Amino acid sequence: MNIVYNSKHYHVVEYPALGSYEVVDKHLGVAGYLQGEVAQVFGESLAQAIAEDPTHDSLDEFLGNFDFLMTQPVRVH
């Protein structure tokens, strides 16, 4: 498990052994689990976004494009 990105708005965790990502929208309180081809494309796109403009604002904007995939409520234990 690798924390790839963390801001006030989003949290992204990579699970390399599974080839998957978990993306959490902290404001909406929802998360999405990406695996397979979707995870591969997401990882490549995220790496490119980080390389082009690694500011929190630009990365949060990029991650906002994936809000529709985040459908699972986040629960705090």
Each PLM stretch: what is its role?
Residues 1-77:
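Polybasic/polar functional segments that serve as interface/processing modules
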